[in-house]
Structures are given as structure tokens and as C-alpha cells.
Amino acid sequence: MADDSYKTIKQIAEGYYTEKRSRFISYAIPVRTVEEVKEQLEKYRKQYYDARHVCWAYMLGPERQTFRANDDGEPSSTAGKPILGQINSYELTDLLIVVVRYFGGIELGTSGLIVAYRTAAAEAISAAEIEERTVDEDITVVFEYPYLNGIMRIVKEDNPAIISQKFEMDCEMTLRIRKGEAERLKNRLLKVETAYLKE
């Protein structure tokens, strides 16, 4: 996968797993921020207030550098870590996985818990539609009106999204393009007379 793209899921997906009468209900939830993670966790804790454990893990950002896992009272590293492991094995980001456990009366042991949480997380991911997204960059170019045709020719050839445009004596256009193609576009725009980039 390119440096300017990443994989995530399109919408919430659900998984289910049972082991020795314990039920594991899992959710893969697309999220963008830690605040969204907190909101979703609160929602699932309220929805499953009667469950023994609500364990989770998340990964955020195109560089996959913001992550956390929580065992919610299960033995250390038997729940959150295996859930996070599934997010990593699918190379996903901007994703929260919540696994709810209803205890079935039989202890699963450390290795049994790890397998159960890993499998439940994998079930939710398998049910999700995975999509690749690009990391984009916005470029604002300022130029004099007589040079509009030169700018528009480049826009037509490189095909960035036009976010905003203002046509006066000094024109301004904000373009959005995939990060890997941004430098080339900037260089082409700067070759047009009177053009400069606005920070």
C-alpha cells in the first residue's frame, strides 16, 4: 500500500462467537478521533450494562500511531491485546473494536480468553466492508486573472478536486489532491506566471 493511503471500514459491522457457553458479541466501528471512541464506548457500555466485560481496542490515523487496548477486568493482555492484534493483522486504522462478553459459567483460562477475543474481533472485521482511502493535501494557489487559462489547463490535466475558487483581479483556488501527487502539482502551478502558493 502506498504511503498516502490507508485501509479502514465503511460502516459498523457485527460478529459473534461462543465458547463454553460464554457469548462474545463484537462490533467493528469506524472512528476518526479519541472523542468518537469515548462516545462509542459509552454507548456500548450502556447498551450492554448487564454484560460481564466490555473489552476494546482502537487504532487511529493514517500512520497508525494512536492506539489503545483495554481488558475491562479480564486477566491482563487476554482481551484488548488480541483485539488490537486483529486490527494490526488486517492493517486497518480509524477503527474501534468492542467485544462484549456474557459469562457462561465456565472459566476459559488465559489461552481460551485470548482465542475467544481474537476470534470475536476477527468475526466483526470479516463482516465489515474494507475500503482504501487516500491521504490528501490541500493547495491554495493565488494568481492574476489573465493567467486563469494556464491554471485551469493544469487542473484539467492533474484532476485535483476544486475545494473553493474566487475570481477577481487576484484569483484564488484551493485544490485537494492525493499527497503523493501534491509536490508535482505545486511545481506545475508555480510555473504559471504570477502564481504563488498561499500557506
Regions found by a protein language model. Name each.
Residues 79-127:
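Active-site beta-strand/loop microenvironment that shapes enzyme catalytic pockets
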Residues 45, 87-88, 118, 122-129, ...:
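Signal for well-folded cores of large energy- and translation-related assemblies
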Residues 33-34, 144-148, 176-183:
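Helix N-cap motif at beta-to-alpha junctions
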Residues 162-179:
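Non-DNA-binding regulatory cores of transcription-related proteins
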Residues 129-145, 173-175:
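Short glycine-/aliphatic-rich beta-strand segments at the starts of folded cytosolic domains
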Residues 142-159:
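Short amphipathic alpha-helix segments
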